[in-house]
Regions:
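Intrinsically disordered, low-complexity terminal regulatory regions
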Residues: 1-49, 60-69, 82, 91-157
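Phosphate/pyrophosphate-binding betaalpha-module
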Residues: 50-54
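Short, solvent-exposed loop/turn elements at beta->coil junctions and helix N-caps
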Residues: 73-77, 144-145
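Helix-to-coil/beta transition segments that act as allosteric "coupling" elements at the rims
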Residues: 75-91
Length: 158
């Protein structure tokens, strides 16, 4: 979450992580976004399932397990109509949904690269879960681009 936040910090965003059950567990918020009325309803402990909030990125991704963007009036409740929310699923080492990573902002903020950044961050979390699950085993890591291989991080369990 922190890596994603630092990539988009200062651009009026909130990063959020919810469990597979749609309950918001943690957020990191730009001050500019945190001061908005919309941000006041996005806080740890709130429930974002489709059953309780209608169409929203966190709840819909928790339900479908696929990445999604919900923009403005696509939200079920009008109170969230000024937001754009981009979410991606996070799966554990066994392929079970572990949670949902989300980046939310007001609809006027630039969204050009956010989808890719959220998906990449979700993949990084999944890699960490996989490494943790298999930390007592020898892992062989292959990639066509060497800059994506970080043996020191893999072997230290980070």
């Amino acid at each position: 979450m922190e890596n994603l936040y630092h990539q988009i910090a200062g651009s009026n965003f909130m990063i959020a992580f919810a469990g597979a059950d749609g309950i918001l567990l943690d957020t990191i918020t730009d001050q500019s976004f945190g001061d908005t009325a919309a941000a006041s309803s996005i806080r740890p402990g709130t429930i974002w399932t489709e059953a309780s909030c209608g169409t929203n990125a966190l709840g819909t991704v928790a339900h479908t397990g696929t990445p999604l963007m919900v923009h403005g009036a696509e939200h079920f409740f009008a109170q969230h109509g000024a937001l754009t929310c981009i979410a991606a699923p996070v799966f554990d080492a066994q392929g079970v949904l572990a949670g949902v990573l989300d980046a939310s902002s007001d609809c006027r903020s630039r969204q050009q690269h956010t989808r890719a950044l959220v998906s990449m961050a979700a993949t990084q979390i999944e890699s960490g879960l996989f490494r943790e699950c298999h930390r007592s085993e020898v892992l062989i890591v292959l990639h066509s681009r060497p800059e994506y291989l970080h043996p020191q991080r893999w072997s230290s369990g980070r």
